């Protein structure tokens, strides 16, 4: 090799050596390098789950989740009825559940199954994220042993999606199908919620709540709480339906679809906000005729949209308040409240359709828009009542038409 060839080879080796000395091995992770999780797809029947409606699958599903905890995991659930005993299934981030048609998670004998979204740290990033349920069916029953139920207990969760899911007779008597505490970016769409046999009639299928142990469907050991409110929830194009018996009468009312009924530490960490309840159908929920209740109830909320929904009574003869918004805090302001373009068919409340109240009438709600609603009824009942003046320039109430 001549002189120039030797020099070029020496120079190249020296440069590579310097680069490796400064940056380390190119195969080793660097301080600012983001490590991608591997993608894994599994079929649950190949991993020990049995869809024979006899075998309990709690341990098998938890084993899958624990074993693949560091993966971007897709879980395919073939057709079958997968039985679950009472207990908890703890999730991790980055899971997609895909259910085949005819695939059902079922529980019975008064058991409650909790899907736990843990939050080992406080703050909006303290929990898990990127969970999708696609086409899932959760089925319970109501027997002499009690109400069997599934609960999604979501604490500081974010980017959680339920699409084309079905929840059948599986709401906790004192709880919820989906329980959101200090969570955000939640998308619930194209799904059906059937039946509610509550011992607390005001409970909602979808609870919008705060990060507080009192609020939880399941108190996961080690979770950290901070009273942060849930925000940015979209509930779109869902159905909330009753169960009828063979004679066509109601055997289980439809769930109250959505709401919130508590606030913690006077809302110092913020209040519930940016909630969208749109294009849904609610049929025959239980009449809530006592003062302070409503089939859709929010306290201390802002940026609320209840729009383009169908509220229908077929077998229920009469309701109480249907939508109830209440400011229970003297100093907090509720603003940007929209109830628009909904239809109310045979609701016939014993009081009014919409009730707005404030614990301090001198602190009314602001930027309220209640317009374009259609009421079909044979009875003359007030559409809106409040305990403060509705003549504020920021309150718009118009084009709410009654049809007999």
Identify the meaning behind each predicted range.
Residues 2-27:
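Sec-dependent N-terminal signal peptides of Gram-positive bacterial secreted proteins and lipoproteins
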Residues 40-42, 57-77, 402-404:
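N-terminal segments that cap or nucleate solenoid repeat domains
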Residues 48, 58, 70-114, 138:
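N-terminal extracellular ligand-recognition/capping segment immediately after the signal peptide
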Residues 59, 65-66, 91-93, 364, ...:
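Extended beta-solenoid/beta-helix repeat architectures
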Residues 61, 85-88, 109-124, 143-154, ...:
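Extracellular beta-strand/beta-solenoid scaffold signature
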Residues 65-71, 90-91, 127, 154-155:
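Flexible, charged surface loops at secondary-structure boundaries
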Residues 99-103, 126-140, 158-169, 184-197, ...:
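Right-handed parallel beta-helix
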């Amino acid at each position: 090799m001549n002189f120039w060839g030797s020099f070029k080879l020496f120079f190249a080796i020296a440069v590579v050596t310097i680069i490796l000395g400064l940056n380390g091995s190119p195969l080793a992770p660097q301080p600012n390098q983001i490590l991608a999780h591997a993608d894994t797809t599994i079929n649950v029947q190949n991993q020990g789950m049995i869809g024979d409606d006899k075998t309990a699958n709690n341990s098998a599903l938890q084993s899958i989740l624990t074993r693949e905890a560091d993966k971007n995991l897709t879980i395919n659930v073939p057709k079958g009825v997968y039985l679950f005993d009472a207990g908890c299934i703890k999730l991790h981030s980055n899971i997609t559940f895909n259910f085949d048609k005819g695939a059902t998670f079922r529980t019975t004998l008064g058991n409650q199954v909790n899907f736990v979204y843990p939050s080992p740290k406080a703050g909006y990033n303290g929990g898990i994220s990127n969970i999708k349920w696609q086409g899932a069916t959760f089925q319970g029953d109501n027997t002499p042993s009690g109400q069997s139920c599934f609960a999604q207990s979501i604490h500081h969760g974010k980017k959680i999606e339920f699409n084309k899911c079905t929840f059948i007779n599986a709401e906790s008597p004192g709880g919820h199908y989906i329980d959101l505490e200090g969570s955000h970016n939640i998308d619930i769409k194209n799904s059906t919620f059937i039946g509610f046999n509550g011992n607390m009639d005001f409970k909602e299928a979808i609870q919008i709540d705060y990060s507080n142990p009192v609020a939880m469907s399941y108190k996961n050991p080690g979770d950290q709480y901070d009273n942060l409110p849930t925000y940015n929830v979209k509930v779109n194009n869902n159905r909330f339906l009753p169960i009828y018996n063979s004679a066509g009468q109601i055997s289980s009312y439809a769930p109250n679809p959505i709401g919130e009924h508590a606030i913690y530490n006077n809302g110092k960490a913020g209040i519930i906000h940016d909630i969208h309840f749109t294009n849904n159908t609610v049929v025959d929920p239980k009449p809530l005729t006592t003062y302070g209740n409503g089939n859709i109830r929010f306290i201390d909320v802002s940026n609320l949209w209840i729009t383009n929904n169908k509220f229908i009574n077929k077998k229920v003869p009469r309701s109480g308040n249907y939508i109830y918004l209440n400011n229970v805090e003297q100093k907090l302001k509720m603003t940007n409240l929209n109830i628009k373009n909904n239809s109310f068919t045979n609701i016939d409340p014993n009081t009014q359709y919409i009730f707005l109240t404030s614990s301090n009438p001198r602190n009314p709600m602001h930027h309220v828009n209640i317009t374009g609603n259609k009421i079909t009824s044979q009875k003359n009942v007030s559409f809106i009542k409040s305990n403060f003046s509705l003549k504020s320039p920021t309150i718009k109430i118009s084009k709410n038409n009654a049809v007999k």
